[in-house]
């Protein structure tokens, strides 16, 4: 059942036609009322901000998107830190820039707030994936009480750029679902793919090498501050670092369980099928572990469906890990970001009772 009949879908086929059981993260899921709540918005990219370069503009960039763009555009021998300076300089040359913020700048703040929640509850579900949040709100409301209320990196970054025209660049379409809630209202939220189209239209096809002046002029907030752990944010790894891990078990591809010395377990789940199985099993048994970190994408955020896939996702993962080892420090500022996310059960509204399979 489609909630958005007769809306253009940019030539994308409905997942119900031909193979109703074939499901991927790039498909529209609005017909089941689970992950995507806005079919039209998820399948479109508004690039109109490139038509008017004069307003004061701020960019919020995810490190996953920046790594993907780096692997698409870099010249031979160019290092990631140099590419960051090239990208920032290019944006400043084209736009009236107020601020550029890499979302990793806020990770230490997020880790600390998440750890406080972890210590105060028996069961915690941690995710900056809006697909997870939307699925739970619409399909698994019995888990709402366990969701971490700490804002996602994109939501926290908005606090640093609001007041100017704001453009956010994220690795998946579902990050648009964070807009208009919890005090967050970006003017534009683009996938990495959409941002690359904007860069191409502005002439960013073969970036010039960065000068020493460009490298020195970058603000701390606009450079990637590498996290620990996975490409999805390192929530579990940060908490595991505060405990003694007795054993780590890989249950299957995309599911890991870490047994702590106090007898409690922290689990990490990635992938759509693994995530849905977890939601379903928790309905009857409840959350089994002290904490579960969960993301819908198979490889975490680095493998988001909004990434440009000229290169294999493994290339992005290798580059992310390599640069992570080169930049071990984490910086953050604390601009009054203690506001929490608010969750609510959402009743799926049906237009009619006709199911068009």
Curated annotation (Swiss-Prot):
Against Gene3D superfamilies, the record matches this protein to: 3.30.70.20, 3.40.50.1780, Fe-only Hydrogenase (Larger Subunit), Chain L, domain 3
Iron-sulfur keyword on record:
yes
The set of disulfide-linked cysteines is none
Binding, [4Fe-4S] cluster 2:
129, 172, 297, 301
- The lineage's top-level taxon is Eukaryota
- What InterPro entries does UniProt report for this protein, alphabetically? Cytosolic_Fe-S_CAF (IPR050340), Fe_hydrogenase (IPR009016), Fe_hydrogenase_lsu_C (IPR004108)
Q: Residues that bind [4Fe-4S] cluster 1, according to the entry?
A: 14, 28, 31, 34
Which Gene Ontology terms describe the biological processes this protein takes part in?
Answer: iron-sulfur cluster assembly
Keyword terms of this UniProt record: 4Fe-4S, Iron, Iron-sulfur, Metal-binding
Q: List the GO molecular function terms.
A: 4 iron, 4 sulfur cluster binding; iron-sulfur cluster binding; metal ion binding
Known Pfam families for this protein? Answer: Fe_hyd_lg_C (PF02906)
Give the protein's function.
Component of the cytosolic Fe/S protein assembly machinery. May play a role in the transfer of pre-assembled Fe/S clusters to target apoproteins.
What does the sequence similarity comment in the record state about its family? Belongs to the NARF family.
Q: What is this protein called?
A: Cytosolic Fe-S cluster assembly factor NAR1
Give the organism, scientific name. Encephalitozoon cuniculi (strain GB-M1)
